[in-house]
A protein has these predicted regions:
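Short alpha-helical DNA-recognition segment
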Residues: 16-34
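DNA major-groove recognition helix of helix-turn-helix
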Residues: 26, 37, 65
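Short, basic-rich loop-to-helix N-cap that marks the start of a DNA-contacting helix
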Residues: 39-52
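The alpha-helix within a helix-turn-helix
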Residues: 12, 23, 51
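A short, Lys/Arg-rich alpha-helix, primarily the initiator
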Residues: 1-20
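Residues within the helices of the helix-turn-helix
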Residues: 9, 20, 34, 48, ...
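Short C-terminal boundary/hinge segments that cap the last helix of small helical domains
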Residues: 55-65
Length: 65
């Protein structure tokens, strides 16, 4: 199974937020953002920070394919 973050990108569009703004709000590194873009594993702490910034649940930003 592979992790997909396509729901994260849809949510960013819905909230009219770009990746740079998300990085600023969550202190995510460029390397971690690249991992998200490639659908690679990232630290759970990063996912929690994203959810806190976007006021959503983990299931709102990721899924297993």
């Amino acid at each position: 199974m592979k992790i997909s973050y396509k729901n994260l990108w849809k949510l960013l569009i819905y909230k009219k937020m770009n990746k740079a703004t998300l990085r600023r709000f969550t202190s995510i590194s460029a390397a971690t953002m690249a991992k998200l873009g490639k659908g690679e594993n990232v630290n759970t702490d990063v996912l929690i920070r994203i959810c806190e910034a976007l006021k959503c649940k983990l299931s709102d930003i990721m899924e297993l394919e």
